[in-house]
Regions:
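N-terminal donor/sugar-recognition subdomains of glycan-related enzymes
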Residues: 1-157
Length: 157
């Protein structure tokens, strides 16, 4: 729980209203966390693993091998899981801001409990459990280059 408190403080500095929402979110047990072969936490919801149970960072790198941004584009990621693919984008495109859309608050809370968010900040803006019309009206969407995290997408079907 200490990591969760540290992450809340970090989130407060960049997105205070989201930090308050996360803090109020009750802990739910439908996100199960196991450890991958290489020692990283991986979330599972029902029968869906959100990352490789062996090498989630390698899976992220391989999955993004053909993802390319033009100089005027903003990377927009649909589905957070535990963010291995987001870190890959941040590493591949240093200095760029990444917009992450995660429709399920409980997944984000579990992410906050299990993953140090410091490497994501300040270049990541999290949009959590927000209706699509609000996302579109609140953000400049013209130059979005979307990446869909496929396991997260399967959850929303």
């Amino acid at each position: 729980m200490e990591l969760f408190k540290k992450n809340l403080e970090l989130l407060r500095s960049s997105q205070p209203s989201l930090a308050r929402r996360v803090e109020r979110e009750p802990k739910k047990n439908f996100v199960h966390v196991s450890i991958s072969k290489d020692g990283n936490p991986i979330p599972k919801i029902g029968s869906v693993l959100l990352h490789s149970k062996y090498y989630p960072s390698k899976e992220a790198k391989d999955g993004l091998s053909e993802y390319c941004l033009r100089s005027n584009e903003t990377p927009v990621v649909y589905g957070l899981g535990f963010g291995y693919h987001v870190l890959e984008i941040l590493n591949k495109y240093k200095g760029l801001k990444v917009l992450v859309i995660e429709p399920v608050m409980s997944i984000f809370r579990s992410f906050m409990e299990n993953v140090d968010i410091e490497p994501f900040l300040p270049n990541t803006q999290f949009i959590i459990s927000t209706p699509p019309p609000k996302i579109i009206t609140s953000n400049q969407t013209v130059n979005w280059n979307k990446y869909e995290h496929q396991p997260s997408k399967r959850l929303s079907c």
